[in-house]
A protein has these predicted regions:
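A small/polar (G/S/T-enriched), proline-flanked helix-loop surface module common
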Residues: 1-80
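Sec-exported extracytoplasmic/periplasmic mature domains
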Residues: 9, 122-130
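A ubiquitous, low-specificity "background" feature that marks scattered single residues
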Residues: 24-27, 85, 93, 128
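A short, solvent-exposed beta-edge/loop patch
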Residues: 47-124
Length: 130
């Protein structure tokens, strides 16, 4: 959670993350960043990075975003590969920007689990308004 100067600033910060232009820019940054990842000392290369949107179902919440970053990681030595999923969610509540991340290998976290966690975060944040 990040507390900002005003509710307007929190809403604007979240709203920009839910635009196609921002996602396209961020996808390009991720692909450029990982395109040169040749393993280094970890012995792992990043073969592919994809970005997609995820639904955020929070009643009464205006600005929100959901984003999945999926990457294919390969072992330099064994050539085995695994998918990495990083799901990032955020919403504005008053002057707070609330974010949640879920990381999983092989398959993404179930949508139902993520939505239940988002609802729980929304309820808890509502109990302690800033």
């Amino acid at each position: 959670m990040t507390v900002l100067t005003s509710a307007h600033v929190a809403r604007e910060g979240i709203a920009v993350l839910d635009t196609a232009a921002w996602r396209a820019c961020y996808a390009g940054v991720l692909r450029r960043h990982f395109s040169g990842a040749g393993g280094g000392t970890a012995g792992v290369s990043v073969d592919r990075v994809d970005l997609s949107t995820l639904p955020v179902r929070l009643p009464g919440v205006g600005e929100s975003f959901g984003l999945r970053i999926a990457a294919r990681l390969s072992s330099i030595r064994s050539h085995l590969a695994v998918r990495l999923y990083l799901d990032v969610f955020g919403f504005a509540l008053g002057r707070s920007e609330i974010n949640m991340e879920a990381t999983s290998y092989v398959q993404p976290e179930p949508t139902r689990t993520e939505q239940e966690l988002l609802l729980l975060m929304d309820r808890r944040a509502g109990l302690h308004p800033l």
